[in-house]
Each structure stands twice: as C-alpha cells, then as structure tokens.
C-alpha cells in the first residue's frame, strides 16, 4: 500500500492511495471464497438439493461485480489505518470532520487507486466583539413581585369548601358566575363572560360591583348598577352608568392560609424555616428566572450581531447535512408533542417543503458558525469548564426528576461533553453580556421585565 499524493485546500484534504497487486489479489481471493460459500447456500441447480450445491460448482456462478465491491469495501478499513499512521497525516494539525469519503480513482493491472477525502472544519473569525449593542436589562426582584408569589402560595394552600345552595356570598368567597354588561340597554364589547371567577373583596371589578354581590345565593340572578370611573382606561366607557346582569353558579368559601413560619416550613425548601427566609428564597428565584430569561434575550441580540460580523471559510456539505438532520428532528419532535404532522405545520406556516428545507439549511449554517465563534472566544479568553462544574450541573438537572435522579445522573454522565458544551456556551454568553453591558442603543430606558 502506498501514498501517491496529498492535496490540501481550505475545504478538504485529499489522499490518493495505491493498493498494490499482491494486496489486491489476496483480499480478492478471500472475498471470492466468502461469496462462493454464500452463493452455494442459496443456489438452485438441477441435480442438487437446495443448499447442498458444492462450493466448486457455485464458483462458476459467482457475481464478479459483487466480489470487486466486497474486496474494495473490505480494504477500506486497512486503507484508513495505513493513512492515519502515515506521517503526512499525523503531522497535519488540521481538524477533520468525522469519517472521510472514499472513492475509486482507477483499477489497472490488478492495482486499485483510491481517493480518500477528509472534509475540514470551517474556521470562523471575528475582528471584535466588545462593540455589541445590547438592550439594557436589570435582573432585580421587586417587593411587589415577591408579595405576589407569596399571595399565590397562600391561595394554593387555602382551605376551600363549596357552599350549599342556601348559603350566601360573603366577603372573601370565590364566586363563579356569568355576567352581561349593558349601557343604555345595549351590550358593549368586553362586557360579558361566562364562568368567570372572582374573589369578593379583591376589587378586581369597578367600584360597587363586588359589594352588590354580597348576600346572593347559588342560581340567583341580579342586576348590578354601577358607574365606570371617570379615569377608566377605556375612554368610551369612562364615566358612564352600566347595568350588569349576573347569574351565580357556584360559591366557594375560602379560608385563607396564615402567613407564618409553619407555612414557610411546609414547602420543605432547603434552609427555609421562617417567613423571611421564604421571602428571601422567592426573591432569589425571581432573580435567577430573570437572569435566565434576559440571558436568552441577550443571546439573540448577540448572535445576530456576531453573524453579521463573522467571516467563515466554506462549510462542508457533510457538516451542513448533519446539522440539518438534527434541526429537522427537533422540529418533528416538538410537533409530535402537540400531535401535529409536518404537512399540517407547513400549511399553517404557508411554506412548501422546499422553503422549509431552505430555512433548515440557513439555520444549520448559522448554528455551525455560532458554535465555532463561541469556541474561538472561549479559547481566546481562556474560558473553560471544569469536571467539577460538569458534575454539579448533572446533579442540578437530576433534581428536576424526583425519583429518577440516579438514572438521570448515569445517563448524563455517559455524555459529559454535551453538558460541558452547554456550560461553556453559557459562560461565553455571560462573558459577552458583561463585556458589552454598557453598549446600549440610543433612546432606551432600563427594563426589569
């Protein structure tokens, strides 16, 4: 076996290999014998029982094209081993894409010439990334947000009892009812609803509405007379008198949960034993949620600017095809969760299969480019992920699957590179956000949403 030539460009490395006559003949003989035995087991010839045809007889019926193809395919692993042990391959530090393609160049005088092509990973570069414009964001939890979560938690643990038909509405009750609003006997837009839920005393409705519901019983009807406030947000209703026909369907007595340390302990949260510790925990969770949401939003802004500034060498088709396949599978998986077929999705989106494929190709190229840029920035800025960080992340993810923690840990531990890639991406995004946090677009105000 000989290396005849090596041709390298920015997209690929091509190696031309010669399999000499002695090697070819040896492997050809092995292939011929193997195929002859297989042929003998299937061949039907008058005078011989099925499967009992002698191998020597079967050799007369062997398909030579099949032998040639089998010989070539059986030699390929040896060719790759030979090539990857050759100095011209070992000393080349180019990053190649997975398995190479192998094609026949020539077969002459009992010698086979093969072309082995390794696609090269593209190289993405960017001149600068400290001038990215980001919408300003404040990752802060406000008191009213914490109180709203506390109120929601209190309501979730309140004692509830559906009242009997002869019991009437009291302040604090939750009422399910239908209503129809009219002004001058004419219904107005947005003034009607069925099975609406209202806690009496919450002041969700206009002044006087809830007070007039007190004392009603299930299945009762009543006309409630109110006046929209002069400063009502819907200017066409502001200051006008209205009548609401209400029909009571269900009354639920709600015994509020008291906000105390026992309530705080009932959630079994780590290091939460008092009301203040519960509020601190909720505060931190709100901050973390905002950080995650704002990080995702910032990455969308960053990604578009990186793509606009980046330069990249041609992306091998094999890499694009693989990423397209992954993206397509992700779409199909998401659609299956909602029991939607791809054909239906394309109809909803008003896209053809060809347009859908074009979108996937564009997304694939962008995904590959961004991944290369993230890796390049990480290397340049010495951003790394330790094995300990991977273990911590695996443990965090396992906690989301109560009762299956160990199985999740074992599964994720089999592919630590995927976890490491996720964490590296997150670190690079946080680095870019911090680097560009003062680069704000003109005429913007801080937002905490």
Swiss-Prot record:
Residues 172-257 form the PPIase FKBP-type domain. GO terms for cellular component: cytoplasm. SUPFAM superfamilies: FKBP-like, Triger factor/SurA peptide-binding domain-like, Trigger factor ribosome-binding domain. It is found in: Cytoplasm. GO terms for biological process: 'de novo' cotranslational protein folding; cell division; chaperone-mediated protein folding; protein transport; protein unfolding. GO terms for molecular function: peptidyl-prolyl cis-trans isomerase activity; protein folding chaperone; ribosome binding. Keywords: Cell cycle, Cell division, Chaperone, Cytoplasm, Isomerase, Rotamase. Belongs to the FKBP-type PPIase family. Tig subfamily. This is Trigger factor. The lineage of its organism: Bacteria, Bacillati, Mycoplasmatota, Mycoplasmoidales, Mycoplasmoidaceae.
């Amino acid at each position: 076996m000989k290396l005849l030539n090596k041709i390298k460009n920015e997209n690929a490395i091509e190696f031309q290999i010669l399999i000499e006559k002695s090697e070819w003949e040896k492997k050809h003989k092995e292939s011929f014998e193997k195929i002859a035995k297989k042929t003998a087991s299937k061949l039907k010839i008058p005078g011989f029982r099925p499967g009992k045809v002698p191998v020597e007889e079967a050799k007369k019926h062997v398909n030579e094209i099949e032998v040639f193809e089998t010989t070539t395919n059986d030699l390929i692993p040896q060719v790759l081993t030979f090539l990857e042990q050759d100095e011209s391959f070992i000393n080349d530090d180019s990053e190649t894409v997975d398995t190479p393609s192998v094609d026949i160049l020539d077969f002459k005088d009992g010698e086979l010439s093969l072309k082995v092509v390794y696609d090269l990973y593209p190289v993405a570069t960017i001149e600068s990334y400290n001038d990215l414009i980001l919408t300003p964001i404040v990752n802060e939890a406000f008191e009213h947000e914490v109180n709203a979560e506390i109120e929601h938690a209190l309501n979730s643990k309140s004692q509830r009892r559906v009242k009997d038909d002869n019991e009437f509405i009291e302040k604090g009750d939750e009422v399910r009812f239908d209503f129809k609003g009219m002004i001058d006997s004419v219904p107005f837009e947005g003034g009607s609803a069925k099975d609406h839920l209202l806690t009496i005393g919450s002041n969700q409705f206009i002044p006087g509405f809830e007070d007039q519901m007190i004392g009603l019983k299930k299945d009762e009807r009543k006309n409630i007379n109110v006046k929209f406030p002069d400063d009502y947000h819907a200017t066409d209703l502001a200051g006008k008198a209205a009548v609401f026909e209400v029909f009571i369907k269900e009354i639920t007595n709600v015994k509020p949960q008291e906000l105390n340390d026992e309530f705080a302990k009932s959630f079994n949260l780590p290091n939460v034993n008092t009301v203040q510790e519960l509020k601190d925990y909720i505060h931190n969770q709100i901050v973390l949620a905002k950080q995650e949401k704002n990080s995702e939003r910032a990455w969308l802004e960053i990604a578009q600017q990186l793509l606009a500034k980046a330069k990249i060498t041609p992306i091998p088709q094999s890499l694009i095809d693989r990423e397209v396949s992954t993206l397509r599978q992700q779409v199909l998986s998401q659609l299956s969760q909602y029991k939607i077929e791809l054909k239906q999705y394309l109809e909803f989106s008003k896209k053809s299969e060809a347009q859908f494929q074009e979108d996937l190709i564009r997304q694939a190229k962008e995904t590959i480019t961004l991944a290369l840029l993230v890796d390049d920035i990480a290397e340049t800025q010495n951003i790394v992920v330790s094995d300990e960080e991977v273990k911590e992340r695996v443990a965090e993810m396992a906690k989301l699957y109560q009762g299956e923690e160990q199985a999740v840990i074992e599964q994720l531990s089999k592919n630590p590179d995927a976890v490491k890639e996720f964490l590296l991406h997150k670190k690079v995004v946080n680095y870019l956000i911090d680097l560009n946090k003062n680069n704000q677009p003109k005429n913007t105000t801080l937002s905490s949403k």
